[in-house]
A protein has these predicted regions:
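Bacterial N-terminal signal peptides that target proteins for export
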Residues: 1-8
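Metal-dependent phosphoester/phosphodiester hydrolase catalytic core
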Residues: 26-512
């Protein structure tokens, strides 16, 4: 018998012994109460996650495609659960077939996890349709009643039921500092881990993670509101990174943070940006907290009745700080990696999954791309000549669709880039309208701003195609060989209503 055949037989025997120790893929006693997840899905691999009830060995089994639930696994791994990892366990499974649906389960003794499902990405040459959904901004903090203070994460349930190839949970996946009055701030690793467990105690999030592959990313509230290391330090950053990576099967690199890209067939490549690891301090101090420092004087005067401070001129030092080329949002290494990758992409559509709005919104710009004007220009310059780019963003707690412009107001009128952005969410936190109400101390102000500024065409407003600032939900995306369609959807799966009262029409981008 050849050495190769001997090795194959020994490997087969070893897998059989592991499989035999857990039996076929039947269920054991219910366990792993926080569910399962599959992240970083590629054509041939995925990173599978669970949280056990105790330290010690855990067996992960992967079922063959189209097999019954009692079939023997095609992969079986033994992984040791450590208390130092908060009992979370992750394993990269390789050697899978592209474009194939797999199921998986974790075991610890006679206790089994729920069954999870994911579909591997198709080959880069596969001319297939791809469907996915995106949302973010989910606070599970309890209110005075002891129940979640905002809602029960119904948006996640709608996404889980949509039958997507994968989903995206991007930004503010916990709230270390909830907007609910009196909530304690989670600063340590242990406190942040408790926030992740709090979210996973809600069934809709567990359903989302088990239903399909899930790409995850952070924004500020995984650390603290409007976070930058320059302002808040490395200690809370390190705690946020550790807790996030314990609970989200994602890939982090010190040089580029959570930036990475994934190809899904001939027609789609996704680029996930990290907007927190390398950004400079905000320009808020130089601007004295001005509510709209970059808005033209005519726009400021038009809204001075709502916010009297807008009648005052903007200090030049404020504008200089916002436009300073020394300040960055992405950092040089991440920007270079992103620029190289998106310019080299052969996918029909390039989707940039983006932590804060790239479009100009003017109100409170400090934490957005507008507050880092030089880096915004660098990104837009990098995207010049790249065809079929669409930006998907969370963070704003609103549903907005608009073109990314280099200039919205001015003597020559709007100057567009041809790049469209869809902002989606939130899942569970104060909506943008309610935040405007609170900031101005005037209930109903958010709806006024949405209708009077976001919808009218320039120079009277931003001219957004869809503007809804007071509805929970997500963005549903369908990619075909010729079109990319984004439909804003509510927490129940319905179409988001525009502030005008009509349904928000989908964004349809046709391949060029």
């Amino acid at each position: 018998m050849s050495r190769v055949r001997t090795a194959v037989l020994l490997l087969t025997l070893a897998v059989s012994l592991v499989v035999g120790s857990v039996g076929a893929a039947k269920e054991g006693k219910p366990g792993f109460p926080l569910g399962v997840a599959a992240g970083e899905v590629t054509p041939t691999s995925a990173k599978l996650w669970a949280r056990a009830s105790r330290a010690g060995p855990v067996t992960l089994t992967v079922l063959p495609p189209r097999a019954g639930t009692r079939a023997n696994p095609i992969r079986a791994y033994t992984v040791r659960v450590q208390a130092d990892d908060d009992l979370t366990v992750q394993r990269v499974v390789t050697g899978l077939r592209p474009g194939t649906r797999y199921r998986y389960r974790f075991w610890q003794r006679d206790v089994s996890s729920p069954l999870g499902t994911f579909t591997t990405a198709p080959r880069a040459t596969a001319n297939v349709r791809v469907r996915f959904a995106l949302t973010g901004d989910a606070d599970a903090t309890a209110g005075p009643s002891g129940r979640p203070g905002f809602n029960g994460f119904e948006t996640y349930r709608a996404m889980a039921r949509a039958g997507n190839d994968f989903n995206v949970n991007f930004g503010d996946t916990i709230y270390s500092d909830s907007e609910l009055a009196g909530a304690a701030v989670a600063r340590t690793v242990a406190e942040k881990r408790a926030k992740y467990r709090l979210g996973l105690a809600l069934a809709p999030l567990r359903q989302l993670r088990a239903a399909a592959g899930l790409y995850s990313g952070w924004d500020d509230h995984e650390f603290v509101n409007d976070f930058s290391r320059a302002e808040h330090g490395s200690e809370i950053y390190d705690a946020g990174v550790r807790a996030f990576l314990d609970y989200a099967p994602a890939t982090y690199r010190p040089a580029t943070g959570l930036y990475r890209s994934f190809r899904w067939g001939r027609n789609l490549e996704l680029f996930f940006l990290d907007g927190r690891s390398f950004r400079s301090a905000k320009a808020t101090a130089a601007c004295g907290g001005d509510i709209a420092p970059t808005a033209p004087a005519a726009v400021r005067q038009a809204f001075a009745a709502l916010a009297p401070a807008l009648a005052r001129p903007v200090p030049q030092a404020c504008l200089d700080a916002i436009t300073s080329p020394e300040r960055t949002l992405l950092g040089a290494a991440q920007l270079a990696a992103f620029t190289r990758a998106i310019r080299a992409s052969k996918a029909t559509f390039k989707v940039v999954v983006n932590p804060v709005p790239l479009m100009q919104l003017y109100a409170l710009p400090y934490d957005r791309w507008e507050g880092y004007a030089a880096d915004r220009t660098r990104v837009l310059d990098a995207l010049q000549g790249v065809r079929n780019v669409v930006v998907l963003t969370t963070d704003t707690h609103a549903h907005l669709i608009g073109e990314v412009r280099t200039q919205t107001f001015g003597p020559s009128g709007p100057v567009g880039t041809g790049i469209w952005e869809v902002i989606a969410g939130p899942v569970a936190t104060n909506t943008y309208a309610k935040e405007i109400d609170e900031f101005l101390g005037a209930p109903g102000s958010g709806a006024v701003v949405t209708g009077a500024f976001f919808k009218p065409q320039p120079p009277g407003g931003l001219g957004l195609r869809c503007a809804q600032t007071d509805v929970y939900g997500y963005a549903q995306v369908t990619v075909t060989p010729t079109t990319l369609t984004v439909q804003p959807r509510t927490a129940s799966g319905g179409i988001v209503p525009d502030i005008s009262g009509t349904p928000c029409a989908p964004l349809v981008v046709r391949a060029t």
